[in-house]
Amino acid sequence: VGSEMCIRDSSKGRVKGYVGNPDVCIPANSKGKLDVAGAVGVGFMNVIKDMGLKEPYVGQVALQTSEIAEDLTYYFATSEQVPSAVGLGVLMNKDNTVRQAGGFIVQLMPFAEESTIAKLEENVQKITSVTNLLEEGHTPESLLEKVLEGFDMEINEKVPTEFYCNCSRERVEKALISIGRKELNEMIQE
């Protein structure tokens, strides 16, 4: 994908991001799935959370497998100390564009009972492929029903997701001015 990948979201479902090489063509691996790990490569995952405190929370982990779901699971366990299960899937069109993507994140509450943990593990292990579930037409709600089978599930709120960029020419100009002419010229020379 390149040297950098940056994704930002908000609690309002607004997402924006960029990758160092947006035109990468991800081939299938030996299992016929997208070779995400091959495209992502080695590196680090940095997570910055603005929790309304004086400074944002910053967590960093080395990528373990470069499979996004697996590395998010690792991040939650090591950086935030929250046992989690993450499953992601992407349906691609023949022209290498994304038809549909989806997934889930399930996190245990502190002091979860062993029976709860065992049931969640059983449910997650039954899900062999989020991509296949998307192909079968599962909705976010029906995906959650599979993950949380045997639990009283209640959807309190639905937050639609959207690409959102709060960038503007004025904001970029202010950022460039704050860097200073000398540093900008040095950056151009490099």
Q: What name fits each language-model region?
A:
Residues 1-6:
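Short, small-residue-biased leader/transition segments that mark boundaries at the very start
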Residues 8-12:
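Glycine-rich loop at the start of a catalytic domain that most often binds anionic cofactors/ligands
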Residues 41, 57, 82-84, 100-102, ...:
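A generic structural signal for well-ordered coil/turn residues at beta-strand boundaries
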Residues 48-51, 94-96, 152-156, 162:
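Short, flexible, solvent-exposed loop/turn segments with mixed acidic/basic and small polar residues
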Residues 125-190:
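Cys/His-clustered metal-coordination modules, chiefly Zn-binding fingers
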